[in-house]
Design a protein with these regions (language model features):
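Residue-level signature of catalytic and energy-coupling elements of molecular machines
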Residues: 1, 58, 80, 126, ...
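N-terminal accessory targeting/assembly segments
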Residues: 2-97
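Short alpha-helix capping/helix-loop boundary micro-motifs
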Residues: 8-12, 44-50, 107-118, 152-156, ...
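Amphipathic alpha-helical transducer elements in NTP-driven molecular machines
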Residues: 20, 30, 55, 70-77, ...
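Short, compositionally biased
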Residues: 37-43, 74-85, 136-160, 178-193
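P-loop NTPase nucleotide-binding/switch module
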Residues: 91-136, 140-146, 163-223, 238-241
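P-loop NTPase nucleotide-binding module
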Residues: 209-259
Length: 260
């Protein structure tokens, strides 16, 4: 650490550092996550996601070599997360302690896996290998989005209960190298998923359950809507009403700042 300006820390790096790279700032026994927001020469400006109280010049910083990532796997539904995908239900107290980290899902839980692919099938990124039912949602277990080539399925486990970290399939690339695939993958939050065959245009109305919206300002499935207004206008209340009544299978509520 070379400089500290509130939660912005200037770090002198002894190697290559990339924009948006994740790093950890150490102060005492506390390890705080941060993100690189600017790089000038060997100086990296990082934004710390925790209080920098007690941090001092000379403290150690470790760079991870990857961007901020989200864990994608069965077990995400009905969870309450902070902005770094820490499970808030696993934390004690009314406030989040500095440096607190919890697993986003229960890695020890078992899920009923049903194979959809067979040995010899040709697959690419996002191809379905199997499925897992979580509550009312049928999750498709896919070839990881980061695998960009065409692969041949070498083996798929039979139907049964498995943990998300267990290998459920093995695929072989063109060079004969095998790749183990589990039910969990990590994806950079700032990188768009592009391994789709088709991106249909919005063509159906999504019923919000609010007659004024459905009549005068209808929203499309796959479309975007927004609610402008001053303080106290009822933006969040309307958002809650849409979340409770809309014709949708999964609702993701994101609260920021005073709404959190």
């Amino acid at each position: 650490v070379n400089g500290i300006i509130s939660n912005i820390v200037i770090v002198k790096a002894d190697g290559a550092v990339a924009q948006n790279e994740i790093c950890y700032v150490h102060t005492g026994d506390t390890r705080m996550m941060a993100e690189v927001i600017k790089v000038i020469g060997d100086a990296a400006y990082v934004q710390v996601f925790d209080s920098t109280r007690g941090l001092k010049i000379g403290d150690r910083v470790e760079f991870e070599g990857h961007m901020l990532e989200a864990t994608l796997a069965p077990g995400l539904l009905s969870r309450n997360y902070d902005g770094l995908q820490n499970d808030l239900e696993k934390m004690d107290g009314l406030f989040i302690a500095r440096g607190s980290v919890t697993d986003p899902i229960d890695f020890g839980a078992e899920w009923e896996f049903t194979p959809l692919a067979a040995a010899g099938d040709r697959v690419t990124a996002a191809s379905w290998l199997g499925e897992v039912k979580e509550q009312w949602v049928m999750h498709k277990i896919m070839v990881p989005f980061t695998m960009t080539d065409t692969y041949t399925v070498k083996s798929v486990v039979p139907a049964g209960k498995y943990r998300v970290t267990d290998t459920v399939a093995v695929v072989t690339d063109a060079e004969g190298c095998d790749h183990d695939i589990t039910m969990v993958q990590r994806w950079p939050v700032k990188q768009a998923v592009r391994c789709y065959r088709e991106k249909p245009r919005p063509s159906r109305v999504m019923e919000t359950g609010v007659r004024a919206i459905d009549t005068f300002n209808p929203m499309a499935e796959g479309g975007t809507g927004f609610i402008p207004g001053p303080f106290g206008a009822g933006k969040t209340v309307l958002q809650h009403a849409i979340s409770k009544q809309a014709d949708a299978d999964i609702i993701i509520m994101v609260a920021c700042g005073e709404r959190a």
